[in-house]
Amino acid sequence: LELHLDRIYPNRDIVAIKTNNIASYTDVLVTCMRQNPKWILLSEVRSAEAVMAVRNSISSGHNILSTIHADKASSVPMRLYSLLESNQDVGQFLATIHRYVQLAICVKGYMSKELGRFQREIMEVCEFYVDENNNPCSNVIYRKNIGGGFVIKNPSKYLLEYLDLQ
Protein backbone atom coordinates (compact mmCIF):
# COMPACT_ATOMS: atom_id res chain seq x y z
CA LEU A 1 0.00 0.00 0.00
CA GLU A 2 2.61 2.56 1.06
CA LEU A 3 4.43 2.34 -2.29
CA HIS A 4 1.20 3.14 -4.16
CA LEU A 5 -0.11 6.05 -2.08
CA ASP A 6 1.13 8.60 -4.61
CA ARG A 7 -1.13 6.96 -7.23
CA ILE A 8 -4.06 6.58 -4.83
CA TYR A 9 -3.74 10.23 -3.72
CA PRO A 10 -2.20 12.05 -6.71
CA ASN A 11 -2.85 15.52 -5.25
CA ARG A 12 -1.06 14.79 -1.97
CA ASP A 13 2.59 15.47 -1.26
CA ILE A 14 3.80 11.86 -1.07
CA VAL A 15 7.24 10.41 -1.69
CA ALA A 16 7.70 6.62 -1.67
CA ILE A 17 11.16 5.17 -1.09
CA LYS A 18 11.91 1.46 -1.02
CA THR A 19 14.70 -0.15 0.97
CA ASN A 20 17.05 -2.61 -0.70
CA ASN A 21 20.61 -3.89 -0.43
CA ILE A 22 21.91 -0.39 -1.29
CA ALA A 23 19.49 1.82 0.71
CA SER A 24 18.94 0.60 4.27
CA TYR A 25 16.16 1.56 6.70
CA THR A 26 18.52 4.09 8.26
CA ASP A 27 19.43 5.60 4.87
CA VAL A 28 15.80 5.83 3.80
CA LEU A 29 14.58 7.36 7.08
CA VAL A 30 17.41 9.92 7.13
CA THR A 31 16.48 10.89 3.55
CA CYS A 32 12.81 11.14 4.53
CA MET A 33 13.55 13.28 7.59
CA ARG A 34 15.55 15.73 5.46
CA GLN A 35 12.36 16.38 3.49
CA ASN A 36 10.62 17.34 6.76
CA PRO A 37 7.44 15.29 6.25
CA LYS A 38 4.46 15.40 8.58
CA TRP A 39 4.28 11.60 8.51
CA ILE A 40 6.58 8.76 7.50
CA LEU A 41 4.94 5.44 6.66
CA LEU A 42 7.29 2.51 7.20
CA SER A 43 5.88 -0.75 5.88
CA GLU A 44 7.06 -3.04 8.67
CA VAL A 45 9.48 -3.00 11.59
CA ARG A 46 11.14 -6.41 11.52
CA SER A 47 14.84 -5.94 12.29
CA ALA A 48 17.15 -4.35 14.83
CA GLU A 49 18.15 -1.75 12.24
CA ALA A 50 14.51 -0.82 11.64
CA VAL A 51 13.83 -0.53 15.38
CA MET A 52 16.80 1.80 15.90
CA ALA A 53 15.98 3.86 12.80
CA VAL A 54 12.37 4.29 13.95
CA ARG A 55 13.44 5.13 17.51
CA ASN A 56 15.86 7.78 16.26
CA SER A 57 13.24 9.24 13.92
CA ILE A 58 10.45 9.51 16.48
CA SER A 59 12.75 10.93 19.13
CA SER A 60 13.61 13.76 16.72
CA GLY A 61 9.95 14.76 16.44
CA HIS A 62 8.89 12.95 13.26
CA ASN A 63 5.60 11.05 13.16
CA ILE A 64 5.86 7.47 11.95
CA LEU A 65 3.14 5.00 11.11
CA SER A 66 4.27 1.40 10.82
CA THR A 67 3.38 -2.22 11.39
CA ILE A 68 4.95 -4.89 13.56
CA HIS A 69 4.00 -8.47 14.33
CA ALA A 70 2.92 -8.67 17.99
CA ASP A 71 0.33 -10.72 19.87
CA LYS A 72 -1.44 -7.63 21.23
CA ALA A 73 -1.09 -3.85 21.12
CA SER A 74 0.09 -3.57 24.70
CA SER A 75 3.09 -5.83 23.97
CA VAL A 76 4.51 -3.64 21.15
CA PRO A 77 7.24 -1.95 23.28
CA MET A 78 8.61 -5.33 24.42
CA ARG A 79 8.30 -6.71 20.89
CA LEU A 80 10.41 -3.81 19.63
CA TYR A 81 12.97 -4.53 22.35
CA SER A 82 13.05 -8.23 21.43
CA LEU A 83 14.11 -7.31 17.88
CA LEU A 84 17.22 -5.50 19.10
CA GLU A 85 20.47 -7.39 18.75
CA SER A 86 22.28 -5.38 21.39
CA ASN A 87 22.29 -5.44 25.16
CA GLN A 88 20.67 -2.01 25.45
CA ASP A 89 19.19 -1.28 28.86
CA VAL A 90 15.59 -2.49 28.72
CA GLY A 91 14.29 0.19 31.11
CA GLN A 92 15.84 3.03 29.14
CA PHE A 93 14.63 1.61 25.83
CA LEU A 94 11.06 1.12 27.09
CA ALA A 95 10.99 4.63 28.56
CA THR A 96 12.00 6.03 25.16
CA ILE A 97 9.33 4.02 23.35
CA HIS A 98 6.65 5.00 25.88
CA ARG A 99 7.67 8.65 25.55
CA TYR A 100 7.46 8.80 21.75
CA VAL A 101 4.98 6.10 20.67
CA GLN A 102 1.47 7.25 21.53
CA LEU A 103 -0.68 4.39 20.25
CA ALA A 104 -0.54 0.78 19.14
CA ILE A 105 -3.43 -0.97 17.44
CA CYS A 106 -3.68 -4.75 17.18
CA VAL A 107 -5.53 -5.96 14.09
CA LYS A 108 -6.36 -9.65 13.67
CA GLY A 109 -7.35 -11.24 10.40
CA TYR A 110 -9.48 -14.33 9.91
CA MET A 111 -11.70 -16.03 7.36
CA SER A 112 -15.29 -15.08 8.17
CA LYS A 113 -17.71 -17.96 7.68
CA GLU A 114 -20.64 -15.53 7.84
CA LEU A 115 -19.28 -13.17 5.18
CA GLY A 116 -17.42 -15.79 3.16
CA ARG A 117 -14.32 -13.61 2.93
CA PHE A 118 -11.22 -12.55 4.80
CA GLN A 119 -12.06 -10.10 7.60
CA ARG A 120 -9.92 -7.83 9.77
CA GLU A 121 -10.94 -6.52 13.18
CA ILE A 122 -9.37 -4.20 15.70
CA MET A 123 -8.75 -6.32 18.79
CA GLU A 124 -6.88 -3.90 21.05
CA VAL A 125 -5.87 -0.25 21.20
CA CYS A 126 -3.24 0.73 23.74
CA GLU A 127 -1.75 4.10 24.54
CA PHE A 128 1.76 4.60 25.88
CA TYR A 129 3.10 7.50 27.92
CA VAL A 130 5.62 8.51 30.56
CA ASP A 131 4.06 9.86 33.76
CA GLU A 132 5.17 12.76 35.98
CA ASN A 133 7.69 10.48 37.72
CA ASN A 134 9.21 9.42 34.38
CA ASN A 135 7.71 5.93 34.63
CA PRO A 136 6.70 4.20 31.39
CA CYS A 137 2.95 3.51 31.49
CA SER A 138 0.35 1.96 29.23
CA ASN A 139 -3.42 2.10 29.12
CA VAL A 140 -5.52 -0.32 27.06
CA ILE A 141 -8.36 1.93 25.89
CA TYR A 142 -10.13 -0.71 23.77
CA ARG A 143 -10.13 -4.50 23.85
CA LYS A 144 -12.42 -6.89 22.01
CA ASN A 145 -13.11 -10.06 23.96
CA ILE A 146 -13.23 -13.53 22.47
CA GLY A 147 -16.97 -13.71 23.12
CA GLY A 148 -17.57 -10.63 20.99
CA GLY A 149 -18.00 -8.10 23.79
CA PHE A 150 -15.55 -5.29 24.32
CA VAL A 151 -14.02 -3.11 27.02
CA ILE A 152 -13.55 0.62 26.56
CA LYS A 153 -11.57 2.90 28.90
CA ASN A 154 -10.95 6.62 28.73
CA PRO A 155 -7.62 7.77 27.32
CA SER A 156 -5.15 9.39 29.70
CA LYS A 157 -4.62 13.12 29.95
CA TYR A 158 -1.29 12.58 28.17
CA LEU A 159 -2.92 11.22 25.01
CA LEU A 160 -5.58 13.94 25.06
CA GLU A 161 -2.90 16.64 25.41
CA TYR A 162 -0.89 15.08 22.57
CA LEU A 163 -3.93 14.96 20.29
CA ASP A 164 -4.80 18.58 21.11
CA LEU A 165 -1.38 19.62 19.80
CA GLN A 166 -1.78 17.83 16.47
Predicted regions and their residues:
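Cys/His-rich Zn2+-binding cysteine-cluster or related metal-binding knuckle/ribbon modules and their
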Residues: S82-A104, K108-G116
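Switch/coupling sub-region of P-loop NTPases
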Residues: L1-T96
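NTP-binding/hydrolysis catalytic cores, primarily Walker-type P-loop NTPases
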Residues: L115-Q166
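Active-site lining segments that contact anionic ligands and/or coordinate catalytic metals
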Residues: R12, N63, Y100-A104, R120-M123
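Short flexible/disordered coil segments
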Residues: Q35, N56-H62, V101-G109, N133-N134, ...
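Active-site donor-binding loop signature of nucleotide-sugar glycosyltransferases
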Residues: I17-T19, G109, E127-V130
